[in-house]
Amino acid sequence: WETEYLYRQLTKGSRTDLGLWGLQCIGMFRSNQDIEEYFADNNITNYLGMSKDQVRPGMLIYKDIRGAQQPDGTYAGPDGIVNVDNDQVQLSNRSNPYGFTTNLGAEWKGLSITAQLGASWGGYQLLPSDARSGLGNIAYNNMPSFWNPDNMYVYQDIYDGSGNLLMQANRGAKYPNLAYSSVNAVTSSFWRISAARAQLSRVTLAYTLPSAFIKKLGVQNARISVTGQNLISFYNHCLMDFLEIL
């Protein structure tokens, strides 16, 4: 991650697009040992307002990037405190920085076809905050499909009062535990997905009627055409995972 910049500020000669900012996710706490090692190795004293004893497996791990701002405007190095004010990194530009649009065409015996193709890439977008946090009270809301129980971290088997298994332990899950959304739903690189897309914007099929035919109708020339707009679009399927519900 690039750190040689004025933190979240415009600088001379740089883009006016400050981009998307958030914490840098470096993993997930999957055991109590992970928590102990992270705090010891990085000299962490405060993790998003929590002490080590308050941190739980199933929470995402964020990197301590910098300390407080200094009188000269720069920031101190990592200070053992992870918070959303001083430890953000640039996750992406606001829009894809690269792209192209091209027009193609062909014609044969009065029949022609033209098409406009476009693509953009190099940027990222974030899953909506409501999707990251579980949409409020999960007992009364439909959930995005990526929160399938098979994908969510569970430290140990969970049973109801009658001894029935409700959730099976899943320490190798892809996604963190929903119970800790105050930590896991923070804007971070974990929720960053590619914003690359390609689209077939327009296709026009046209036919020029034979002059021998139309001159009998008193017309010099005539052309019939059919145009389709926004026909095909390819983009990151993760957004569809958000739109679909369990």
Where would I find each of the regions flagged by the language model?
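Surface-exposed, extracytoplasmic segments of Gram-negative outer-membrane nutrient-acquisition systems
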Residues: 1-95, 103, 112-192
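Membrane-interface anchoring segments and C-terminal beta-barrel signals
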Residues: 127, 134, 157-246
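Repeated loop/turn-to-beta-strand initiation elements of outer-membrane beta-barrel proteins
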Residues: 110-114, 212-213
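Hydrophobic, lipid-facing positions within transmembrane beta-strands of outer-membrane proteins
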Residues: 98-104, 111, 200-205
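Short, well-ordered loop/turn elements at secondary-structure boundaries
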Residues: 97-99, 107-110, 219-221, 227
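Outer-membrane beta-barrel pore domains and translocons
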Residues: 107, 118-120, 227-231
